[in-house]
Amino acid sequence: MPSKRVPEFSLEHPLASAFAVIRGVLFSPKIFYRDFEAEGPLKEPTLFVLLVGAVTGFLGAVVALASNLSFGELGLGDVWSAVLEGLLFALLSPVYVGIAAGFYLLAIRTFVGKVGSLEEVYRIAAYAFGALILFWIPVVGAFAVTYAFMILMGIGIHSVYRTSFITTVVVALSGFVPVATALIFVTTLG
């Protein structure tokens, strides 16, 4: 049975392809990563991360402003802070995904062997980042981070590098702990 081509982000149809990727990652990640080619260009995955980061940053700013408004404490400083946080989230998302890919590559090289490259792991992480489209929703955001950087990365690593279940769990946890710690640290700075 021939494998279908995985829907990847395309500059020709950015919104349609972004929805296809997010739908594939959120609702059928095993199928998405089963047919995923880790080797490929970085431009489209990076722009996908920027798009998801921009949407999430914007919606996060809207939620923060609505929350402040509902408590009657909306001032110019609150608006400036929400806009700046949303903008920084959007612009720094590709950097954060790159750092996460570095942690996962270190775990892969430690527990799997000398396989993979930073570019391959970045592509896996970039599309897993699509789950963070839900990050702006209070409470759901914590689950979205865990789903993206533990579950989806585990599925991606298992599918691309053909690792055993236990190796996948160890690699996913070894990569997730520093990624989550860094995210908590950065979030508490703001």
Feature-to-residue mapping (PLM):
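N-terminal juxtamembrane cytosolic/stromal segments of multi-pass membrane proteins
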Residues: 1-55
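Membrane-interface segments at transmembrane-helix boundaries
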Residues: 23, 103-127, 158-163
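Hydrophobic alpha-helical transmembrane segments
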Residues: 1-3, 25-37, 67-80, 115-129
